[in-house]
Every structure is written in C-alpha cells, then in structure tokens.
C-alpha cells in the first residue's frame, strides 16, 4: 500500500518555488518541495501573489483511504484530538536536475520549532533511515550535545505534541523544544553552541 501511495503522491506537481517576502520576488526551493492537501479544495500555484498549490484529497483515493484509517486509529486513542488537521507534504530529494544535469543534493531543515501549529502527525513515505532530531533549548542554546535521534523509514508514523513541535520556540526565556531533519549540514550544532559546552 505504501508504494501505491508513493506513486499517487508523486504523480501530482509539488511546489518548487515560493514568494520570498524579504526579497520581494519568486525564488526556487532548494532543500525540499512542499504541497498542501485539503478535502474539497484545490488551487493552482500563483507564487507572485503568495499562493502555493493545493491538491484536493478527494482526488487521491489511496491517500484519502490511508489518512482516514490513520486518523480513525489516532482519534480512538486520543478522544478525537486528530480532527480538523491539515495535510502538508515535505518532499526531499537525493538528486535533482540543476542546469540540465542530475546532481546529488543535500536536503533537510535546520533547528527550528513550528510556531504556526500545535500538533503534528507525520507519515514517512519513501524514506530510508531519514534522520530526525529533537533537542530542548533555553536562551537560544541547546541543553546538551546529545539530541534525541530517530531514523525514519517508509511507513513510519510519528506524532508531535505542542511541546515536541516547539510551538513557543521563539520564547527564548522558556525551555522549548526544536527539531531538525536530513543531512548533517542541517542537523549539526552551530559552532557557538559547541563552544558553550566545551569552554
């Protein structure tokens, strides 16, 4: 089933560009592609007007079926806490066409929290030992040099609570959790963080 789901989700175009609010222009996405999925809603991308693509979940029969099964299981165990969630996809590549040549690329996302959401249910599709890291932070620094690490494979599911997702990660005076994923260039600690523990 997971292979069928992979084929279905990769058959639709994903957002590989975005509107950069700082530079005020459309730029290419380098580390990953994104896509939003909603039931009964579709939208073509219009990057100059800050609009990404939306795919109607009803048009993806296998995705709709698996989401329904997954949410039913989670809702039974959590008294309905998986209701009214939005499906968002992050697509990572090991190789990409750059200047008409297929090249190896580093992909991932650096240490951050998700201020825009309070809970996350993630289904890994097509991943092979894909690294996910979590760490507590206080006053812009990690609490230690040993983040919690998980290697995700296709079919794995993980759930992040409000604390795990790092919804308040910008409040540096509080203990908050951040996460990172992918290549070591994204998950490694900053030089000043390491120096904080070694000096």
Task: Give the residues covered by each predicted segment.
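Non-heme Fe(II) oxygenase metal-center motifs and adjacent flexible, charged/small-residue loops
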Residues: 1-199
């Amino acid at each position: 089933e997971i292979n069928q789901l992979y084929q279905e989700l990769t058959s639709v175009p994903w957002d590989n560009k975005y509107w950069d609010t700082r530079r005020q222009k459309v730029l290419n996405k380098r580390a990953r592609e994104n896509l939003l999925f909603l039931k009964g809603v579709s939208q073509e991308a219009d990057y100059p007007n800050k609009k990404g693509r939306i795919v109607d979940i009803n048009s993806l029969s296998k995705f709709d079926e698996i989401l329904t099964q997954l949410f039913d299981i989670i809702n039974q165990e959590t008294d309905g806490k998986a209701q009214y969630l939005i499906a968002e996809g992050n697509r990572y590549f090991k190789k990409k066409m750059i200047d008409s040549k297929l090249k190896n690329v580093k992909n991932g996302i650096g240490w951050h929290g998700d201020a825009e959401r309070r809970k996350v249910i993630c289904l890994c599709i097509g991943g092979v030992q894909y690294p996910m890291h979590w760490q507590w932070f206080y006053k812009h620094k990690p609490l230690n040099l040993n983040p919690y690490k998980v290697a995700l494979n296709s079919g794995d599911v993980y759930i992040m609570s409000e604390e795990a997702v790092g919804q308040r990660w910008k409040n540096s005076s509080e203990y908050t959790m951040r996460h990172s994923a992918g290549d070591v260039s994204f998950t490694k600690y900053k030089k000043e963080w390491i120096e904080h523990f070694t000096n």
